[in-house]
Amino acid sequence: MLANQLVTKLYPEILRGEVCITLLSNSPDHFYKPAFMYVAFNQFFDEELKRPERSLLRPEIDFRVDEVTRFDFAGQHLHTRSGKRYGYDFLVIATGCVPAPERIEGLKEAGDHFYQYAAARQLAERLNAIERGRIFISVSFPKTPNVPHQCGIAPVETTLMLDDLLRRRGVRDKVEIIYTYPSVAQLLRNCLFMQRPVGEALPGIFEQRNVRFQRDFTLGRVDPERRIAYSEEGEEQPFDILMATPPIRAVDAVLESGVSQAEHDEGWLPTNHETLQVYGLQGVYVIGDTVDLPISKAGGACHNQAPVIANNITAEIRLGAPNSVYEGRVQAVAQMGLNAGMPLWYDYAHDVLPTPPSKLGGLLRTGFNRGLYWAVARGML
């Protein structure tokens, strides 16, 4: 998305041979990661959620499948797995984050999540097999203050999708669903969601669907043999399936760069909340999940960050200084069950204002999942 937007902005300079754009990736394929959530409910499969990266890029972009293993910011070079070294004048770090369930004792062994394809397929098999019991949902935030977990609305979405799935299977009356939220959720305390308006709307939604909910359950450890989740607050919850939003961290190369000031070695890069430059590094920008900003680590954030960075790099080349400001804008359509959707948007100054879920909203989300996303990735929307 961003590379394509840079080509559009800098096309005259590219034609004159004054600018070249290189994209380094650790995979030849581009994955639509928000669809991993749907994999857990048998609505997406591997070939439906990926495209060859090259097919999404403008021909002017030099695309290389070569994973970055080390950043040399002082020398303005990148070292890669192949042993090559790439120089840069401007760098955009878009390495995302990775689930780290091993950071909570027992969670890797006993928990399931939907933030990677293989993990989501495993969860799908367990959800398809359960006939009775308890499905326990937990959410873990980063330890870095005021940094959200990956895709903030996803635990709510999957809870409601789970309710629909079990009803379709005819076992909902035999399976208990328990949604929990930690004591500290960015700037909020004792809540069910990290933004107050949505959190206040959730009890009514959950009660209508007979979903139990509990505030102040910060997952501390899991006993895989007894299948019990223990909270830092001293409570315990037995489960048959533990559907977790696990801890997350930056990728190894970012962790090892020494630039992050985040607590507990999480690796988030110190980001200027307006320009999206990395503090203390000349010509380096960051987009998406690796930022230390208080906004959602989700595609709806990247969609709004990309044009800001494209404008700022273009302005630095032509004018000598960045000229665009990111206002914290995020938009998405939340999946409120298997068929319903809820459009939402927010920014630094405004919280999400929940609206009634509808089938029209669900159709909009389906259209984005199945087609519009690939136009966004090409920089067309």
Residue ranges and their predicted role:
Residues 20-22, 61-71, 163-266:
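A Rossmann-like FAD-binding core segment of flavoenzymes
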Residues 310-381:
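C-terminal, flexible cofactor-proximal segment of oxidoreductases
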Residues 61-168, 243:
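FAD-binding core/adjacent interface of flavoenzyme oxidoreductases
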Residues 15, 83-87, 234-237:
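Glycine-rich phosphate-binding loop signature in dinucleotide/nucleotide-binding domains
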Residues 108-132, 226, 238-241, 245-304:
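FAD-site-proximal beta/loop scaffold in flavoenzymes
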Residues 131-208, 212-214, 298-328:
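Rossmann-like dinucleotide-binding core of oxidoreductases
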Residues 1-62, 146-191:
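Beta1-alpha1 glycine-rich phosphate/pyrophosphate-binding loop at the start
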